[in-house]
Amino acid sequence: MLEVKTVDKPDERRDFPRGHLDALHLTGLDFAVGTFEPGWRWSESVAPIAGTESCMVHHNGYVVQGRMHLRMDDGGEVEVGPGDVFVCPPGHDAWVVGDEQVVVYDFAGGMAQGYAKAAGA
């Protein structure tokens, strides 16, 4: 079966401090668009919602705009920007770099399914 949806009309939206997530759910694909404002940091904006010390969601991402810094719990770090495709396993923090909004497309599914949802929700 063919399915088409537009990011302009997501199935759900989750707001959190300094950002929001739009999720689209299709057969075999849960797709997310994350929008993060300057000053956003996962450990400050989403950790209180998730109830974990670091982000435990796996990401397969594409950066549309802005720059984001990722720091793994094991100390590994990277900065991603427009046009970058990245894989980030669970166990990390992240934050916006600079004063430009960050927009990330995430194809891994976990972000669309459970990101910024309270544990057990």
Tell where the protein language model's regions lie, with residue ranges:
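A short, N-terminal "cap"/entry segment at the start of jelly-roll beta-barrel domains
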Residues: 1-35, 43, 119-121
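Double-stranded beta-helix
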Residues: 3-9, 95-121
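Conserved short histidine dyad/triad with adjacent acidic residue
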Residues: 33-54
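Conserved GNAT-family N-acetyltransferase fold
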Residues: 34-36, 61, 86
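Short beta-strand segments in beta-sandwich/barrel cores
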Residues: 41-42, 66-71, 94
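Glycine- and acidic-residue-biased ligand/ion/polar-headgroup-sensing regions
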Residues: 48-74
